[in-house]
Amino acid sequence: MDKHHHQHLLLQHHQHLHHHQKLSLAKSSRQSCSEWIFRDVPSDITIEVNGGNFALHKFPLVSRSGRIRRIVAEHRDSDISKVELLNLPGGAETFELAAKFCYGINFEITSSNVAQLFCVSDYLEMTEEYSKDNLASRTEEYLESIVCKNLEMCVQVLKQSEILLPLADELNIIGRCIDAIASKACAEQIASSFSRLEYSSSGRLHMSRQVKSSGDGGDWWIEDLSVLRIDLYQRVMNAMKCRGVRPESIGASLVSYAERELTKRSEHEQTIVETIVTLLPVENLVVPISFLFGLLRRAVILDTSVSCRLDLERRLGSQLDMATLDDLLIPSFRHAGDTLFDIDTVHRILVNFSQQGGDDSEDEESVFECDSPHSPSQTAMFKVAKLVDSYLAEIAPDANLDLSKFLLIAEALPPHARTLHDGLYRAIDLYLKAHQGLSDSDKKKLSKLIDFQKLSQEAGAHAAQNERLPLQSIVQVLYFEQLKLRSSLCSSYSDEEPKPKQQQQQSWRINSGALSATMSPKDNYASLRRENRELKLELARLRMRLNDLEKEHICMKRDMQRSHSRKFMSSFSKKMGKLSFFGHSSSRGSSSPSKQSFRTDSKVLMERTCASTD
């Protein structure tokens, strides 16, 4: 009750203030009129405008205003003494200026009052038909010769015209100011472009690449336009696009306008967001991607039209490689029990990213197969893959996240998008840790997403001991670890003897985990455990073997260095013998010890090599 009573008192207070303002306006109007009307001639007509009364004389008014002349003529018999002018544009303040003009009182026409005076001259019919150099022609001249030559004045007139619609539009005040703004902005940019032209050392004319501060590129008008109402701002932007203003300038203006208007609470927020989205240039990267994500968040909160959100999602998908993890974390505002973040919106953005340039999909695949990491499409794909894996890891602990939605995000990119599956494995492990009640079939669905051959050594070692993974997946990890170790052995020691037949058979007998359909689940489980133990033993043996080979490889390098030094000394002695001062050549005698020494060293090396391979 106290709250409602307080609101009632506030309402009464506002009504009292509004009534007091009307009385003050009427009183001030009467006081101001008494300062410039004919004091020695009594008033014969009272004009009422929005609650304000003006005690005036018929003759000055009817000599300039066709409307008042007609009203007085229609009531000549009754000798009318009071006229109420309803819906007069600009209100009492503007009428006072028009009345002064009728009385020949000088006042200044400015960009702050020209729109009101232009409209009131039309309302009162103050045209050349009734008097030469009337108010209509005076305001027309000022608008055309002064306002339309200056961009800031045009913006100010548009701002003043907001309360004069639709009359200001019908009188073409709005249209002329918008055209003037677009023309001036385009001319400023052309002039700025010419100012950046310079001659190179070769004498050719080119555009300077010097980065200029804000306002030096003919974009100083951006802040000025932010004061306009959204409907007029939209018309100005469309006119600028038609005139050829740079997309970067349009984008910068949209960012400035959104930062000004969307930071304050307004009932027109939804309209503002939807309008800004329609005004976005078609070119990419003309506005920051964080700005687009901010618009999308507002669009979700304000429940804008479907077309607005789909347009934003399409734009974001086309430049998703520029996004960060914070950009993707769009809060969900639907209902209780839903996920913390909006998964469906992110999925649609990923679909847009995957489908962009669909006509070039074959070319992309061919480039990928040719292993060209410098391809821009590949670079973008790899960046987005890392971003998606980070996003999956962020949303994985959410208890309300269904497996189907997790799979939806994880499978949104093509298989070749990930060259390394460490990030995906980490996200899946976090999901398994947070959702321990998953069935074995659900765990297998998650594990199938991972290509265990694309795990790093650290991730593979972690996965081999991860009890949250299905046993079949652990077997696959161990199997691929075995293959990697064998490959490492072959590359580090190319002269290794062929593998024993029994070892080869054992390696190939351990398959990738595919189980026979004819075996019972109990036998399958026992078989997997057995293969798991065998793989672990095999891996342990291979690691020991690899360590031994690395040690022997170091010893062999030392022996080779020693052998090389002995061979060098022998060759040096041989050459010195040929250069004997006595003129005798005993090459046979001098070379034989050298050869014998080399044979001895080679024999030692071969024995060590054979011993190491055994």
Swiss-Prot record:
Biological or metabolic pathway of the protein: Protein modification; protein ubiquitination
Coiled-coil regions, chain positions: 522-562
Domain of life: Eukaryota
Disulfide bonds: none
Residue span, BTB domain: 43-111
Alphabetized UniProt keyword annotations: Coiled coil, Phosphoprotein, Ubl conjugation pathway
PTM-bearing positions, type Phosphotyrosine: 425
GO terms classed as biological process: protein ubiquitination
Ranges for region Disordered: 492-525, 583-614
Keyword Zinc annotated: no
The keyword Phosphoprotein appears for this protein: yes
Skewed-composition ranges (Polar residues): 507-521
PROSITE patterns: BTB, NPH3
InterPro entries listed in its UniProt record: BTB/POZ_dom, NPH3/RPT2-like, NPH3_dom, SKP1/BTB/POZ_sf
Gene3D superfamilies (UniProt xref): Potassium Channel Kv1.1, Chain A
One protein family per Pfam: BTB
NPH3 domain mapped to chain residues: 219-484
Stretches with biased composition (Low complexity): 583-597
Domain description: The BTB/POZ domain mediates the interaction with some component of ubiquitin ligase complexes.
Chain's role: May act as a substrate-specific adapter of an E3 ubiquitin-protein ligase complex (CUL3-RBX1-BTB) which mediates the ubiquitination and subsequent proteasomal degradation of target proteins.
Family: Belongs to the NPH3 family.
Protein name, entry field: BTB/POZ domain-containing protein At5g48800
